[in-house]
Swiss-Prot record:
Disulphides: none
Stored NCBIfam families: PRK00099.1-1 (NF000955)
Gene: rplJ
Any one Gene Ontology molecular-function term assigned to this protein's record: structural constituent of ribosome
Keywords of this entry: Ribonucleoprotein, Ribosomal protein, RNA-binding, rRNA-binding
The protein's name in its UniProt record: Large ribosomal subunit protein uL10
Role played: Forms part of the ribosomal stalk, playing a central role in the interaction of the ribosome with GTP-bound translation factors.
SUPFAM superfamilies named among the record's database cross-references: Ribosomal protein L10-like
One Gene Ontology term from the biological process aspect of the record: translation
Amino acid sequence: MAKAEKVTAVAEIAEQFKSSTATVVTEYRGLSVGKLTELRRALGAEATYSVAKNTLVKRAAAEAGVEGLDDLFVGPTAITFIKGEPVNAAKALKTFAKENKALIIKGGYMDGAALSVAEVEQIADLETREVLLAKLAGALKGNLAKAAGLFNAPASQVARLAAALEEKKRAEGGAE
């Protein structure tokens, strides 16, 4: 690879680091091209699975301000650049790694911090953002309905009491 190509490659990888919400570093030793294609399909449109030379990736990470990943760039390494929801891509990687022992998750990077393998797997075990928001909305709606019922109960009780008193007065007034 010529020096100009290396400079261009480093700039492209650095841009991917900067524009990603998260990255996951994997070892792909022993995976066929067909399996890598299958993995890329499983990741979907929100993630890009890239294979590059470790020295170029290290330089790009440093250029992008990504720290703490240098130890992961040993051996055949690939990086998943996640543009959207990190949970979906992490789930896809974890599932694929379970089914294909040749894929090894080494770690990752999200929100300015390096992630261990365990942390990447914890992200994979989370519900998606939409599901969590729906659960929160459901919990809030239920509690708001209970609160509204509590606030409305005294008013309706007072209204029933006033109606009963009025009826009692009419009954007493009609009896006299």
